[in-house]
Amino acid sequence: MLHSVNSNNNNNIIKLNIGGFKYITTRETLILNSSFFNGLLNSDCGTVIDSKGYYFIDRDGELFSPILSFMRTGTFTLPYRMSLNNVYREVDFYGVDRLSALIQHKINISNITSVAGGIYFISKLPLTSNNNNIIINNSNNNNRKILHAVIKANIMALYFNDGYLEIWMQGMSFQWVKILTHLCFSNEYHIKELTARILKNDLNETTSFSLAARTSTERKVLIWFIDLDYHHMKVKIKERDITINHDIDYFHFLISNSFLACISMYGLITIVDLADQINLVSNNNQINQNNQINQNNQNNQNNQNNQNNNFKVIILEDRVSGIANSNESSLFIACSNSKVYELKQNIKRNWEWSIDEIYKLYDPEFFHNTFGFSLTNNNNNITNNNTNINNNNNPNSIYGNENNNNNNNQQNIINEIINKRRIRNNNNCSPLVTCLNSSIITNGGRLKSVLVLGTDDGVVHFLYKSVRDNMDRFYFASTYTLCNEGDDPISKVLISGGEEGVFINAISTSGISKSWHFIFNKQQQRVTGNSVYTGSSTKCIGCISLSSISNSNNLFNNNDNNDDNSFSINDIINNNNNYFNIFKFKNQKDLHFTSNSNNQKENNQYNLDGNFKFSSYNQIKVVIDQSNNLLVFAGSHRNAICALDYELPSTPILIIPLMDKTKVQRILISTFGGCEPTIHDQSFQLLTFHQSNQIYSWSLKEINHYFISTTETILNNDNFLNNINNINNNNNNNNINNNNNTIVKKRSGSSPLISALNNSILNSNNNNNNDNNPINNYDH
């Protein structure tokens, strides 16, 4: 019961009931910061107090929480998914002048033309010298440079030109801190490329960070296994160098970091069993920001020479042009003969490694379901499948003891293979796969493995297969052309998606970037839950020209070997590249960026108001313009239904002016939870590496509302509004899809909005001229 009383109260404890949210604080906290509460508590006018002594204020109680926190501590923190503008209106009502000025400043600098990064700037990493703890600045950093960097989850590895390797970690309650400084084996090993992999526990914490480096010797690989102990704040590092008897152009961790695949561009593959290939360096190293490990390099190398290597060797029939992976148990390899192979352990063959042909460009055999064909049945294509480095009795083995008399013969075998591949490549006129990317998505309640290929003739090929089917091969779904076919090779591709379909992004060497949306047949409607045989549909939803965004800094592509930047077309990417571009995923539910999703599960799909489902990933493109602004373009929508009646904006959804005006050398994405995002992933960052040897981190959690929603697009469509009126006047409970004669029943009691969305989907499908055969889906 509410009643009016006199506000003169000597009690210092004040109880507030603001819109149903109850707060307890002191009188001084309120009257010293708020003109509203100063008048409320000190005036003689009557106030409304309930029977329990709470002052009742009819405002939004949830928005009052950060305001009260500021009045208590003097620090303002915007809660997750709370609008800054809404909080500002409440601050103005309560008359908290200091907070009002602070928020007004944040609103001003958060505009798309803000200065020096605005609210998106988080921190600047404090890089230090290894000789002392002096922080590196622009005046004394000429001697120490970052040569390579790689990030997985919240762990980052930096390799410097002085031979030191630094490991950095980001936590939920703290920004980047250095946990390890490690001197590599020797300065004679100039690292050319890094690749990394992580393992997580049930709490979604990164517990193991595996790092491999390809060196300038072309045949030497350095490997580090780093174990993190969060509870005792300790780190362990194990180190090993391995010599491969052929050049290494690609390498990748497999099977929970237990194996390392080393691949030559000439088709030689060596799979290294890492179980006995690591050498313990330190078992009890305390985590701190300037931890440095001393080691005896000579003793380590002597111990490494005494260990036996366990290698598996596979020889492909042609040159390798690129690699990609959709999960840690297999690796997709593209070759110059227009074929794509899958490297994996064969369960039926006692877990032996095998290589299977899964697709060939323009081969009609892959246009329909047939029985798979495995190269493991052809002894001419796979040799030395069981070769062990300790088996020196095999004269055909390309590995053996250094003192073996057949060592020259073994090297001759390698040279003969390479020479044949060179001749074959010069005479090859078939399309060359220049890049590829893969993912696992949930569609129609089933898992699908999707693969996209880019070729040197400017064509993008989209392939798919069901994960549950006991088949190795992929099947053709659609092809796309960026511009003039044959004149503009594809340099980068990305694929992701979910229940609403598949999103494909591609960029050519000339800077043309296009986005496509593909919907499978037998699509399940989000609004009714019914399966509708609509036929496959595809549409180009966006196109931008990155070459028009000239960059005076002449940025180059980062060739560090992570999941999204580790492809084979280095000459194409680095050739006259006047822009910088990366493709990444944006997690819609948890608002963070992540590297390529390798193990998406069905629980990655979430419900919106019980009606709509959407993919857990969106795509963005990041570009640096000539004014040193960071431009973010949308590569997909925010959430969608099945209709394709929308287009992506051609203008950036976000512009961040960078603080450092030197050219950006690389851009990396960081997520706390890991490269496989879950509901526990709570943050994401974008890191820019500058020529000044400085690293800046940027928060992008605010960009979610910049993505367009196709649901909103349909609601603003005149045809959609007409559909609502027609449905309200229609008492028939059945809609007939004349395109495929499938009857769709509405749910009883469905609202006009739901019915209109359903009708909009059917109209969109009826306007689609493509038939049910995905072979006919071409977009030029």
Swiss-Prot record:
SUPFAM superfamilies to which the protein is assigned, alphabetical: POZ domain
Short name of one Pfam family: BTB_2
BTB domain mapped to chain residues: 10-80
Domain of life, source organism: Eukaryota
GO biological process: protein homooligomerization
UniProt cross-references to InterPro entries, sorted A to Z: BACURD1-3, BTB/POZ_dom, SKP1/BTB/POZ_sf, T1-type_BTB
The protein's name: Uncharacterized protein DDB_G0287347
